[in-house]
Amino acid sequence: MASLLRRRFYSSESSFAQRLRDLPKYLPGTNIKTQVSQLIGKTPLVYLNKVSEGCGAYIAVKQEMMQPTSSIKDRPAFAMINDAEKKGLITPGKTTLIEPTSGNMGISMAFMAAMKGYKMILTMPSYTSLERRVTMRAFGADLVTTDPTKGMGGTIKKAYDLLESTPNAYMLQQFSNPANTQAHFETTGPEIWEDTQGNVDIFVMGIGSGGTVSGVGQYLKSKNPNVKIYGIEPTESNVLNGGNPGPHEITGNGVGFKPDILDMDVMEEVLMVSSEESVNMARELALKEGLMVGISSGANTVAALRLANRPENKGKLIVTIHPSFGERYLSSVLYEDIRKEAQNMQPVSVD
């Protein structure tokens, strides 16, 4: 009897295991994504209302906070890693990815590395926010912070030093990788064109690696050569306007040099926006529009408002981007006063 029960038990167990193996990996006919990278893209455009009162033009802003890691950098990170894999340059589980970053690109790369199975080493200036560092570490990336006085140049140099000393290492090189620009030519640009039904007149965007303004600009120009494209750089680090690199608070913009992938010919002009203007506008967007965004989003909005107030742009549709979510900036200058206020709050008595 005992022998018979054992046979039945193991037979039942074997049958159950076999049924599990026979299950399809995904349920057919469902609208369920098979992996989180499929959530990248298709972010919405929304009109500005209160901050744009009195302007002669319409301003619509693409909300990249809706990406998996709350920033636009998910697009090029996904594109560059996939491109390198297709070319046989990197292999999950074998290659160590090394990349210099000011924050958001590093987070997106750490996210992709975790999903695909790469070891990730990121170099970044030590002035970047605590939230960025914690988020990168949460995705398993190793961080190396560099001297803030050396800017992104110092961060890039350290990344190359690590590249030489690390076995099986590879750098995707966001500042010179054509896949960065191509990501925006193939996704961001077409999304803007489709959502505006081809009615976009002006696109304005801050310049970091240059991938977004170049890719979107090239796509929109291919659809309508009359679309005007404008770039933005920090007033304090206006190298594209012939000035000198310098410290500023617009994280992700104004890297202090002209990136290789930046298409200067696609732009009408590179506007200059100060850190103070950018910070103040980012705060105003939260209070007046309910849009909690980062400092570069503030810069993009300031520039869009300037263009909207030019007489020749009356009645036109201006599109810009809010590249990242404001919660990533809680420890930065953006919310310094509120942070101190919150830290000093005292509990009230409850009867």
Curated annotation (Swiss-Prot):
Entry-linked InterPro entries: Cys_synth, Cys_Synth/Cystath_Beta-Synth, CysK, P-phosphate_BS, TrpB-like_PALP, TrpB-like_PALP_sf
Gene Ontology CC annotation, any one: cytoplasm
EC number: 2.5.1.47, 4.4.1.9
A Pfam cross-reference name: PALP
Protein's recorded name: Bifunctional L-3-cyanoalanine synthase/cysteine synthase 1, mitochondrial
Role this protein plays: The cyanoalanine synthesis reaction is more efficient than the cysteine synthase activity. Probably involved in detoxification of toxic cyanide produced in plant tissues.
Residues with N6-(pyridoxal phosphate)lysine modification: K73
Keyword Transferase listed: yes
Induction context: Up-regulated at the protein level by ethylene and 1-Aminocyclopropane-1-carboxylic acid or naphthalene acetic acid treatments. Down-regulated at transcript level by methyl jasmonate. No effect from wounding.
Protein encoded by which gene: PCAS-1
UniProt entry tagged with the keyword Transmembrane: no
PANTHER family, per the entry: CYSTATHIONINE BETA-SYNTHASE
Residues noted as binding pyridoxal 5'-phosphate in the record, renumbered to the chain: N104, G208, S209, G210, G211, T212, S296
Transit peptide, UniProt annotation: 1-10
Keywords in alphabetical order: Amino-acid biosynthesis, Cysteine biosynthesis, Lyase, Mitochondrion, Pyridoxal phosphate, Transferase, Transit peptide
GO biological process: cyanide metabolic process; cysteine biosynthetic process from serine; cysteine metabolic process
Expression sites by tissue: Expressed in tubers and buds. Detected in leaves.
Superkingdom of the source species: Eukaryota
UniProt cofactor(s): pyridoxal 5'-phosphate
Family: Belongs to the cysteine synthase/cystathionine beta-synthase family.
Subunit structure: Homodimer.
Catalytic activity: O-acetyl-L-serine + hydrogen sulfide = L-cysteine + acetate; hydrogen cyanide + L-cysteine = 3-cyano-L-alanine + hydrogen sulfide + H(+)
GO molecular function: cysteine synthase activity; L-3-cyanoalanine synthase activity
Subcellular location: Mitochondrion
Comment on pH dependence: Optimum pH is 8.0-9.0.
